[in-house]
Amino acid sequence: NLKRVTLELGGKSPCIVFADADLDNAVEFAHRGLFFHQGQCCVAASRLFVEESIYDEFVRRSVERAKKYVLGNPLTPGVSQGPQIDKEQYDKIIDLIESGKKEGAKLECGGGPWGNKGYFIQPTVFSNVTDEMRIAKEEIFGPVQQIMKFKSLDEVIKRANNTFYGLAAGVFTKDLDKAVTVSAALQAGTVWVNCYMANSVQCPFGGFKMSGNGRELGEYGLHEYTEVKTVTMKISKKNS
């Protein structure tokens, strides 16, 4: 019983912010790219690389943005974050947050449950995160932002690709040559430049490496529902 399947298996997507980027734009998109839907998003920008010269200011603004979140019933006007999907996922996120604290990441805000009822987790931001930490390697699927520092283009490309996953990525820069170079080098099925999660039904979507196989959407998505046939016919006499 051979099944043909298209698989989208999540990721640990890098988001790279260069010093020449529009900082306000980068902070906002990086924030939305992670905290959307309580962080329960397959393309979440869960490995945020920020160039060294703007790192401290980027962290400050990111923390300021995260602290503006209002938690509660997501159907209530004005609420920006609801609960996690279930207890199993809630426990996994809390465990990963605790691992970040123990492994030496700096907790900038959040870092635990919210309220006394339901599976709510405070919007959490870690700085001084290093690549070997669990929060930098494992898909958290929750409202936990990890901000890492880099010095050079070659370094950040190598670090961004050092993962089993390859679903999506983001690049923030005003330098077109840099944007093209990095986009081509990143091992990801989708790369957004100066934006994040800007999806279109015309664009194929899917992952590299352990993030899956096959594509959804666009012309490539239709190929998954078709069969290719070859017919070869021998003609006894040419007609012309």
From Swiss-Prot:
Q: What's the top EC group for this one? A: oxidoreductase
Provide the tissue specificity. Non-lens specific, predominant form expressed in the liver.
Q: Answer whether the UniProt record assigns the keyword Cytoplasm to this protein.
A: yes
Task: State which residue ranges cross the membrane.
Answer: none
SUPFAM superfamilies annotated for this entry?
Answer: ALDH-like
Coarse class of the protein's main subcellular location? cytoplasm
Q: What is its EC number?
A: 1.2.1.3
In this UniProt entry, the residues modified to N6-acetyllysine are K106, K149, K151, K174
Family designation: Belongs to the aldehyde dehydrogenase family.
Role summary: Elephant shrews, in contrast to other mammals, possess both a lens- and a non-lens specific class-1 aldehyde dehydrogenase. Can convert/oxidize retinaldehyde to retinoic acid.
| Protein's recorded name | Aldehyde dehydrogenase, cytosolic 2
